[in-house]
Each structure stands twice: as C-alpha cells, then as structure tokens.
Amino acid sequence: MSDWERNHPEQLGTVQTERLPAPPAPPRQENLIEFYVGPTATFRYFIDAASLTVLYKQKEVRYVLVARSPSGADNVSFEAIRCPDMHRIYAVGDASKWSERSGGWQEIQRRTGVGVPGVLAREYFCPHRDTLQSAAEGVDALRRGGHPLVFTAPRNLGL
C-alpha cells in the first residue's frame, strides 16, 4: 500500500479502520516543555516530554499537547504527526480523563506555517521531512527551540 493510499482511504472506496492507541497518562507540570508557535499566538504551548513517542516505521510522532490560555486554563490533547504532512487528534481531555476523537488524519499546511501542527512538524518533529529517530531526539529539539537539522535547510525552497 502506498503512502497516498494509507493517508487517503476515504478516496479508495473502502474506508480502513485504524485502531486508536491508548492515551498516555495525563501530563504533569514538571514534564512540560514550552515551544514557540509564532508572534500572533495568544496561548502558550507545551509538549509533555513523558508522552513523546516515535514510531519510526509508521513515520509517526505521538505526543500530549497542552495549550494554556492567558487566564491559565489548560486545553489538553493527545495528538500525532505523520511526517512530513499529516496530523491527527486521538483524544482530548483534562487532568483526570480522556475523550476519544473520531476524526482521521488531516493534511498539514506546511508552507504557510500556520497552526501548532505545522510548527511542530516543520521545526521540531520532521527535520528535512523525515521522522525523528527517537523520543529523546524530539525532547532535545523542544529544549533547544528547534531541531538542529532544520536550521541547515534553505529557507527559500518552501521546506
């Protein structure tokens, strides 16, 4: 099966059902790593380092995202990026429970860089459009403020 077939089953005439992964434990404050989304972001964004998982063969990076409002309220979601350009929300929740989301994979608009999935894919989790080798590599990229390989790519090619 090609990548296109795997990412667009609804266009094949038969919809394939994907088994949803079990959500990780709720995030803990000491495991949150803040990352920069852009100058117009009103929320602060964090990845729970303990939840970061890399499935290299599937080209998938799973993580818990915390979006903190200016008032301090947290929106928590269990998400994934399928490198280089697909995104999915598996579940949303709070500190005590998760609620599964039934939506499938959505394309990331990488060239515009709009939105959290685009920033995570481009700057942290899909360097040179490839998947991270390990969760430790992703945690390192978050702590550095970006993946070191990203900054060597020519910016004028729309990567």
Please annotate each region the language model reported.
Residues 40, 88, 157-159:
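Mature, folded catalytic cores of secreted/periplasmic enzymes
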Residues 71-132:
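An exposed acidic His-Trp-rich patch
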